[in-house]
C-alpha cells in the first residue's frame, strides 16, 4: 500500500498526487490554504517518499491502480483529484480507469499530451545521467522548474525541492522516468 497522510477538516475529499522526484511534503504550502475546505489525502507515489517500489517501470496506469487501492481502503467516492506534473499524468490515468470515482480533476503544471519524440529522447538521456550522477541531475534540473526571474526570492523553495528530490530512491526515479517515456 502506498504511504499517505490525511489532514484537514473539510466536507469534501481532495486526493493530492505530487510530481516527479517529489513526495507528499511538497503540498505543505497548499495544505494550509485548503485544509478548512477539504479533507486532504496526500499520497506518496510508488518509489517516492515512503512508498515502496512496485516494478522496474512505474507506468502511469500502475501508479493509478496503486492510488485506487488507497482510495478504496479509505472508502472514497466522488472525490476531487489534484495532480502536479507527473502526478497529473497519474491523475489522467486514474480518470481513464476509474472516472466514476471522481468529482473533479485538476492538473498543476501538467499536460494530457503524450511526450513528443524530442521529449522522449530527453527522458532517455536523463536515465543515463540519473544512473551516473543523480545529485548533479537534481542540482542542475530543479532550478529549471522555477521562474528564472524569481530565482533569488524562491531560493528557499528550490532548496526544499532539491532536498526532497535527493531523498527520492534512485530506483524510484528511474522507474518513473521509464513510465513517463511509455506514456501515450
Regions from the PLM with identified roles:
Residues 61-79:
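Conserved acidic catalytic loop of the alpha/beta-hydrolase fold
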Residues 2, 38, 100-103:
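A structural micro-motif
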Amino acid at each position: 500500500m502506498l504511504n499517505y497522510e490525511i489532514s484537514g477538516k473539510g466536507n469534501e475529499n481532495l486526493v493530492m498526487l505530487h510530481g516527479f522526484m517529489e513526495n507528499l511534503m511538497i503540498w505543505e504550502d497548499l495544505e494550509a490554504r485548503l485544509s478548512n475546505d477539504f479533507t486532504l489525502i496526500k499520497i506518496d507515489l510508488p518509489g517516492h517518499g515512503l512508498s515502496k517500489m512496485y516494478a522496474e517501470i512505474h507506468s502511469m496506469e500502475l501508479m493509478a491502480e496503486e492510488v485506487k487501492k488507497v482510495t478504496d481502503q479509505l472508502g472514497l467516492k466522488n472525490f476531487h483529484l489534484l495532480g502536479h506534473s507527473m502526478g497529473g499524468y497519474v491523475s489522467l490515468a486514474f480518470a481513464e480507469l476509474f472516472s466514476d470515482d471522481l468529482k473533479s480533476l485538476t492538473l498543476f503544471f501538467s499536460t494530457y499530451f503524450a511526450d513528443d519524440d524530442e521529449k522522449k529522447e530527453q527522458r532517455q538521456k536523463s536515465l543515463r545521467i540519473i544512473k551516473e550522477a543523480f545529485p548533479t541531475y537534481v542540482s542542475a534540473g530543479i532550478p529549471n522548474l522555477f521562474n528564472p526571474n524569481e530565482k533569488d526570492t524562491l531560493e528557499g523553495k528550490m532548496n526544499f525541492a532539491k532536498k526532497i528530490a535527493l531523498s527520492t530512491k534512485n530506483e524510484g526515479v528511474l522507474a518513473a522516468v521509464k513510465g513517463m517515456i511509455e506514456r501515450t
